[in-house]
C-alpha cells in the first residue's frame, strides 16, 4: 500500500521548475481575495471619457451651426432688419403723437371745466335777472349784488347781433370791407368787452369794489334794454317812438347800472366820473346802433347830396321867335319837336 503512493508523491515533489512559482502561490496563499489597490484606476473610466468627448463634439457642432445660421440670417435679413427698425420708429412716433393729442384734449376739457361754473345757471334765474336789469334800486349804503355768471350776458349779445342783422337787411346796408355777420359780431362783442374793460379800469382808479366778471355781467344784462328798443324801432319806423323808447327803456337799464356802481364807489367825484362815463357810452351806443343801420341814413345822405340826377338828360325846349313873320313856322317846328320827343320817350 505504501509502495504505490511513493511515486505519486515523488511525481508531485519532483515537478519541474516551471511549476514552482505556481505551486508556491497555491501553497503560500490559502485565500482567493484580489487586491483592488494594485488595480489600475484608469481601466474602468474609458467609457466615461468617450461619452464626454462625444458630447463635447456635439456641442461644438451645434455652436458652429448656430453661428453659421446667424451669419446667414444677418446677410439675408439685413434689409428686413432695417425695415423692422424703421417700422418701430414710425410706431413710436405715432404713439408719441397720439399721446400729445390726448394730453391736449384732456387739457382743453380741463379748461372748459374751469369755465363751467360761470354758465351754470337756471332759466328762471336768467328771467328774473333780465327783469331786474330794468328796475333801478336806490341803495347807496350797501353794495348791491351783481350776478357772477356769463350765460345771460352772452345770450343777450348774440340776440343783439341777430337784431342788427335784421336791421341791416331791411335797410339795404352795404358793407364793403366785411360781411354783415362779421360787422354785427364785431360791433356787439367789441362794445361789450371793450367798454367793460374800460369801465373796470376806471373803477380800479376810482377804488370801486367790482370785479371784471361782475362788470361783464352788469353791462351784458344792461344790453337787454337795447335789444327791446332796436327790435321795436327796426320794424316801426317812427322817430318819435324811437326817442321815447330810448329815454324810457334805455334810460332804465342805464340807471340800473349806475345805481350798482354808485353803491360800490366811495366819494362824489369818483361816482360822477365813473357813472357819467358809463351812462354816456351806453346811451350813445344805442343811438349809434339805431342811426347806423336804419333807413334814416339813406334819407340823410339823399338830403346832403341832393337827388340822383343823370349826368346828361335831354329836355325839349321851345325855339324863341325873333321876328313876328317867323312865328308861324317856329310854332310848327316846336310842335313837331315836341311830338318827336314824346315819340322817343314812349319807345
Curated annotation (Swiss-Prot):
Topology versus the membrane: Multi-pass membrane protein
**What is this protein's tissue specificity according to the annotation?**
Expressed by splenocytes (at protein level).
Native source species:
Mus musculus (Mouse)
Q: Does the keyword Cytoplasm apply?
A: yes
Q: Read off the lineage from the record.
A: Eukaryota, Metazoa, Chordata, Craniata, Vertebrata
Chain ranges sitting on the Lumenal side read 167-184, 235-237, 293-347
Q: Which InterPro entries match?
A: tRNA_Mod/Golgi_Maint (IPR051521)
BP terms from Gene Ontology:
cell differentiation
> Per the record, what is one GO cellular component?
Golgi apparatus
What the record says about family reads:
Belongs to the YIP1 family.
This molecule's function is given as: Involved in the maintenance of the Golgi structure. May play a role in hematopoiesis.
**Top-level taxon of origin:** Eukaryota
Using the UniProt annotation, give the residues that carry a glycan (glycosylation sites): 334
Q: Which residues carry this modification: N-acetylalanine?
A: 2
In which broad location class does this protein mainly occur, judging by the first location in its UniProt entry? Answer: membrane
Q: Where is the region Disordered? A: 1-31
**Which of the residues are on side Cytoplasmic?**
2-145, 206-211, 261-271
| Keywords from the named record | Acetylation, Cell membrane, Cytoplasm, Differentiation, Glycoprotein, Golgi apparatus, Membrane, Transmembrane, Transmembrane helix
What is the protein name for this chain? Protein YIPF3
State which residue ranges cross the membrane: 146-166, 185-205, 212-234, 238-260, 272-292
Q: Where in the cell is it found?
A: Cell membrane; Golgi apparatus, cis-Golgi network membrane; Cytoplasm
How is the subunit organization of this protein annotated in UniProt? Answer: Interacts with YIPF4 and YIPF5.
Amino acid at each position: 500500500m505504501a509502495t504505490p503512493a511513493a511515486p505519486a508523491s515523488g511525481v508531485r515533489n519532483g515537478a519541474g521548475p516551471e511549476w514552482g512559482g505556481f505551486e508556491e502561490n497555491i501553497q503560500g496563499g490559502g485565500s482567493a481575495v484580489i487586491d483592488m489597490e494594485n488595480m489600475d484606476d484608469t481601466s474602468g473610466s474609458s467609457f466615461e471619457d468617450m461619452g464626454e468627448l462625444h458630447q463635447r463634439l456635439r456641442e461644438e457642432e451645434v455652436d458652429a451651426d448656430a453661428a453659421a445660421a446667424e451669419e446667414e440670417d444677418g446677410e439675408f435679413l439685413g434689409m428686413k432688419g432695417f425695415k423692422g427698425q424703421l417700422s418701430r420708429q414710425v410706431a413710436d412716433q405715432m404713439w408719441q403723437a397720439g399721446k400729445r393729442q390726448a394730453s391736449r384734449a384732456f387739457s382743453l376739457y380741463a379748461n372748459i371745466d374751469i369755465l363751467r361754473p360761470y354758465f351754470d345757471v337756471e332759466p328762471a334765474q336768467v328771467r328774473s335777472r333780465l327783469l331786474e336789469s330794468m328796475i333801478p334800486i336806490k341803495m347807496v349804503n350797501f353794495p348791491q349784488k351783481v350776478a357772477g355768471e356769463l350765460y345771460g350776458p352772452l345770450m343777450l349779445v348774440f340776440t343783439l347781433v341777430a337784431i342788427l342783422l335784421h336791421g341791416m337787411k331791411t335797410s339795404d346796408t352795404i358793407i364793403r370791407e366785411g360781411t354783415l355777420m362779421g360787422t354785427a359780431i364785431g360791433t356787439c362783442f367789441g362794445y361789450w368787452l371793450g367798454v367793460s374793460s374800460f369801465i373796470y379800469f376806471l373803477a380800479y382808479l376810482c377804488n370801486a369794489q367790482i370785479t371784471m366778471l361782475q362788470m361783464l355781467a352788469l353791462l351784458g344784462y344792461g344790453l337787454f334794454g337795447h335789444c327791446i328798443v332796436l327790435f321795436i324801432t327796426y320794424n316801426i319806423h317812427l322817430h318819435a317812438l324811437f326817442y321815447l323808447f330810448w329815454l324810457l327803456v334805455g334810460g332804465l337799464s342805464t340807471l340800473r347800472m349806475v345805481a350798482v356802481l354808485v353803491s360800490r364807489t366811495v366819494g362824489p367825484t369818483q361816482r360822477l366820473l365813473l357813472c357819467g362815463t358809463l351812462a354816456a357810452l351806453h346811451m350813445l351806443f344805442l343811438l349809434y346802433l339805431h342811426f347806423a343801420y336804419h333807413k334814416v341814413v339813406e334819407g340823410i345822405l339823399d338830403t346832403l347830396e341832393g337827388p340822383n340826377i343823370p349826368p346828361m338828360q335831354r329836355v325839349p325846349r321851345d325855339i324863341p321867335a325873333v321876328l313876328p313873320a317867323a312865328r308861324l313856322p317856329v310854332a310848327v317846328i316846336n310842335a313837331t319837336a315836341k311830338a318827336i320827343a314824346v315819340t322817343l320817350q314812349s319807345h
